[in-house]
């Protein structure tokens, strides 16, 4: 059996949401070359092995996360910094724990479902404001929020694109209806982060905040 861990970035941002597995795939301008690469990988694999399984996750998280996404929030929490949140904080993010990803791969290899393309992800999205609250809570730190209303590029100071999208994960839920609680997963992520900070690929968000928002 072939299983490709693709990405929800294969859905062009212009498609109706929530994205579902029946929609056409193509380049998403938010994700650029990353999106194009994932689309190309899907086309290549499925043209050669039509019975391969393709899995399209949203933001993956959990222990061994070396991208400076939730680790950025953890660092701010440890430093007891205010946390700068884009807009009104209501933009939604969709996550999926790496352990749930592994459980799902195991399930499809064991069950061999008729469907071969699956969106995966938590059933419920979370606002960026609530996400910050959960990360600070996982780190055991109080949170003071600052909402940024007038800066054009949130990636200067925040670790997620200004892009909200939702996935239809009903096919996933027929096979694996339960996902790890987001707070519990973030707590696991923080425990890994504490001992592995040197593994994280940092970006200069804090420097930008100190130079522009203080």
Predicted regions and their residues:
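Active-site Tyr-X1-5-Lys
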Residues: 29-55, 69
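Amphipathic terminal alpha-helices
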Residues: 182-214
């Amino acid at each position: 059996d072939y299983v490709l861990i693709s990405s929800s970035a294969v859905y062009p941002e212009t498609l109706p949401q929530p994205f579902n597995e029946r929609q056409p795939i193509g380049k998403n301008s938010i994700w650029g070359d990353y999106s194009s690469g994932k689309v190309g990988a899907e086309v290549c694999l499925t043209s050669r092995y039509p019975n391969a399984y393709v899995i399209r996750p949203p933001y993956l998280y959990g222990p061994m996360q070396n991208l400076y996404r939730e680790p950025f929030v953890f660092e701010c929490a440890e430093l007891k910094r205010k946390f700068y949140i884009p807009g009104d904080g209501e933009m939604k993010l969709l996550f999926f724990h790496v352990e749930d990803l592994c459980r799902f791969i195991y399930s499809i290899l064991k069950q061999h479902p008729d469907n071969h393309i699956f969106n995966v992800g938590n059933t419920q999205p979370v606002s960026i404001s609530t996400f910050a609250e959960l990360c600070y809570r996982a780190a055991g730190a109080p949170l003071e929020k600052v909402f940024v209303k007038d800066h054009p590029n949130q990636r200067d100071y925040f670790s997620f694109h200004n892009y909200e999208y939702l996935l239809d994960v009903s096919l996933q839920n027929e096979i694996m209806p339960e996902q790890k609680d987001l707070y519990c997963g973030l707590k696991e992520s923080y425990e890994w982060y504490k001992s592995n900070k040197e593994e994280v690929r940092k970006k200069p968000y804090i420097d930008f905040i100190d130079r522009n928002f203080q």
